[in-house]
Amino acid sequence: MKKILVVDDEKNITTLLRAFLEDTGRYQVRTENSGEAGYQTALQFHPDLILLDVMMGDLNGDGLADRIKNDPLLRKTPIVFLTGIVTKKEVEENDGVIGGYPYIAKPILVLRELLDCIEANIRKSG
């Protein structure tokens, strides 16, 4: 079973994503509602992939991604950003990658797209 960490400051989003991903029977999911808590959980949980909100209060997604990529224990962990600051069209025009990271635009309207993105990025990482 693959491990996924969801970090988003909106509790309703983490709750929804956790329920959806766990219901597939393929993922063990942990959630956090702040960047700092997400980093600490990543160190302990060793996720196979991190779903990460871009805009958060204490430590935004870019800052957390930088910390993860500079940490020897976590640097190979794939990150997929969840964001409401780009449109689905912008994500598609950039082949789902902006700033070097794959993105999923919120709201996530087609959950199958999320699963496909998760699986593709876990496969890429090894």
Q: How would you label these PLM feature ranges?
A:
Residues K11-R30:
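Two-component/phosphorelay signaling modules centered on CheY-like receiver
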Residues F45-L51, M56:
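Active-site beta3 strand of CheY-like receiver
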Residues T31-Q40, G61:
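Helix N-cap/capping motif at the beta->alpha junctions
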Residues G63, V86-A120:
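Alpha4 helix (beta4-alpha4-beta5 surface) of REC/receiver domains from two-component response regulators
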Residues G57-D58, D66, R75, T87:
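The feature encodes the CheY-like receiver
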Residues H46-D48, L73-P78:
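His-Asp phosphorelay/catalytic-motif detector in bacterial-type signaling
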Residues V7-D8, E32, I50:
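Conserved sequence signature across two-component system core domains
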